[in-house]
């Protein structure tokens, strides 16, 4: 036996399965301002006490399933995560909210990738847990300040576009796949000249055989410049720079900048947080706005007892960097409860958000002037939803109508005109003190 092993044995070092509860469940722990706090919805397996399940969640901070001899080379008390509080979920059998505190030193500065790898990278497969959901995170000020955040933010975007006092209008070009680059550009032009502020590549428009990315970028740039000349307004098209490699993604963003367009787009979940943060840094350095699409989010956030809700993904996007993010509609075809949606909309836009469990916000969050993100309402909405959308999302938003623009029987430009007229009527009515909730349909009829 080596001297090191002999020493460990003499002080009680024993191999075997570790009892998580003894190490990671510390109900007397007082959280620090520098801790990252997490609220997990825990569903233990039958026979597993909630304290053990909560402690197992915290194990991802430093642990493994057994005691190892290298534990003696560091301070477990300094670095371990701690499950410091557990409470039952009202109205749900065998579900608990477990609160876990992680010391800040566990995380690399400015890395959403590392944060998620540490907190949720492994624990969701533990046998002791039937299901696990990360409900919310409290990001401490000390960690927030290590992130650049959105490339520009809400106010800078409005200044770039010279558009104030109303929501912005967008449209996703349809059909999303199958058009040639020239026909695609024609659809963009018709929408922009009709009064929209933005048009958009759909999330899976990258560089397919029928429409290579460079051709699409060129025809879309031609369309927006022509629409700008005709309308006197600044226009944009979300050119999707998402690609198979980070190098190719940046190459596409560079070409967009050379064309002089104002905004590019990234599928930040399928592309990954490392790629997204890299693109966000490029966009800030080169004056491009960044539209982030949440493709794949429902794989992660739709289940009520497993995965993580969109509020966590929204916080991560604000840290990683994006000037826009899709946020559901409340009234459209995609799932989204009003209060929960407004909860993460506030997390995207506001500088300081108070704890409010009724809206799914488990912790007070201080963003310390990190730029805000504009929420994008998109998915199954049309002109008759305009009063509700204007009331729900307010001015600092993008209201994005795909089929609600392109489906107009007279064509794309009349569809865009209808949306612009409806929006301006709703904003004027709101400013005059009219109730959009009760008078919305009447306001739209008057405008038509």
Curated annotation (Swiss-Prot):
Keywords in alphabetical order: Acetylation, Calvin cycle, Carbon dioxide fixation, Chloroplast, Disulfide bond, Lyase, Magnesium, Metal-binding, Methylation, Monooxygenase, Oxidoreductase, Photorespiration, Photosynthesis, Plastid
Residues at which Mg(2+) binds: 200, 202-203
Subcellular location per the Swiss-Prot or TrEMBL entry: Plastid, Chloroplast
Record propeptide residues: 1-2
Top enzyme class: lyase
Listed InterPro entries: RuBisCO (IPR033966), RuBisCo_large_chain_AS (IPR020878), RuBisCO_lsu_C (IPR000685), RuBisCO_lsu_C_sf (IPR036376), RuBisCO_lsu_fd_N (IPR017443), RuBisCO_lsu_N_sf (IPR036422), RuBisCO_lsuI (IPR020888)
Other facts: The basic functional RuBisCO is composed of a large chain homodimer in a 'head-to-tail' conformation. In form I RuBisCO this homodimer is arranged in a barrel-like tetramer with the small subunits forming a tetrameric 'cap' on each end of the 'barrel'.
Entry protein name: Ribulose bisphosphate carboxylase large chain
Biological processes, Gene Ontology terms: photorespiration; reductive pentose-phosphate cycle
CDD domains, per database record: RuBisCO_large_I (cd08212)
Modified residues (N-acetylproline): 3
Catalytic activity: 2 (2R)-3-phosphoglycerate + 2 H(+) = D-ribulose 1,5-bisphosphate + CO2 + H2O; D-ribulose 1,5-bisphosphate + O2 = 2-phosphoglycolate + (2R)-3-phosphoglycerate + 2 H(+)
A GO term, aspect molecular function: magnesium ion binding
Function, in words: RuBisCO catalyzes two reactions: the carboxylation of D-ribulose 1,5-bisphosphate, the primary event in carbon dioxide fixation, as well as the oxidative fragmentation of the pentose substrate in the photorespiration process. Both reactions occur simultaneously and in competition at the same active site.
Site (described: Transition state stabilizer): 333
One GO location term (cellular component): chloroplast
Binding-site positions, substrate: 122, 172, 176, 294, 326, 378
Record field: transmembrane: none
Record: active site: 174 (proton acceptor), 293 (proton acceptor)
UniProt-listed SUPFAM superfamilies: RuBisCo, C-terminal domain (SSF51649), RuBisCO, large subunit, small (N-terminal) domain (SSF54966)
């Amino acid at each position: 036996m080596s001297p090191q092993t002999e020493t460990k044995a003499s002080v009680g070092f024993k191999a075997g399965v570790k009892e998580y509860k003894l190490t990671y469940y510390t109900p007397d722990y007082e959280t620090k301002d520098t801790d990252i706090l997490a609220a997990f919805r825990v569903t233990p397996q039958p026979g597993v006490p909630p304290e053990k399940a909560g402690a197992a969640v915290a194990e991802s901070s430093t642990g493994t399933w057994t005691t190892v001899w290298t534990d003696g080379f560091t301070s477990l008390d300094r670095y371990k995560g701690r499950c410091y509080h557990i409470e039952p979920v009202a109205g749900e059998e065998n579900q608990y909210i477990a609160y876990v505190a992680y010391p800040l030193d566990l995380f690399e500065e400015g890395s959403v990738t590392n944060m998620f790898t540490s907190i949720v990278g492994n624990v969701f497969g533990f046998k002791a847990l039937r299901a696990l959901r990360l409900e919310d995170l409290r990001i401490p000020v000390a960690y927030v300040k290590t992130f650049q955040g959105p490339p520009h933010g809400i106010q800078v975007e409005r200044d770039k576009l010279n558009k104030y006092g109303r929501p912005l209008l967008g449209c996703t070009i349809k059909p999303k796949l199958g058009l040639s680059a020239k026909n695609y550009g024609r659809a963009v032009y018709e929408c922009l000249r009709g009064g929209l502020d933005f048009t958009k590549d759909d999330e899976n428009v990258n560089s397919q055989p029928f429409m290579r990315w460079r051709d699409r970028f060129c025809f879309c740039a031609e369309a927006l410049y022509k629409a700008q000349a005709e309308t006197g307004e600044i226009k944009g098209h979300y050119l999707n720079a998402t690609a198979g490699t980070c190098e190719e993604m940046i190459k596409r963003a560079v070409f967009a900048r050379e064309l002089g367009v104002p905004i590019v787009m990234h599928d930040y979940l399928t592309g990954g947080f490392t790629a997204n943060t890299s693109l966000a840094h490029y966009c800030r350095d080169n004056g491009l706005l960044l539209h982030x699409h949440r493709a794949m989010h429902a794989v992660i956030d739709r289940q009520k007892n497993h995965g993580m809700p969109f509020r966590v993904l929204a916080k991560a996007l604000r840290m990683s960097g994006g000037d826009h993010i899709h946020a559901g509609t409340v009234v459209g075809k995609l799932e989204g409860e009003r209060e929960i949606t407004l909860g993460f909309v506030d997390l995207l836009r506001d500088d300081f958000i108070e704890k409010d469990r009724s809206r799914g916000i488990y912790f007070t969050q201080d963003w310390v002037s990190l730029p805000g993100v504009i929420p994008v309402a998109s998915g199954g909405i049309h002109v008759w939803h305009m009063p509700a959308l204007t009331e729900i999302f307010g001015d600092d938003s993008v209201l994005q109508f795909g089929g609600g623009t392109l489906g107009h029987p007279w064509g794309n430009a009349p569809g865009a005109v209808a949306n612009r007229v409806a929006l301006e009527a709703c904003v004027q009515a709101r400013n005059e003190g009219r109730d959009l909730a009760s008078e919305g349909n009447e306001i739209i009829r008057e405008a038509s």
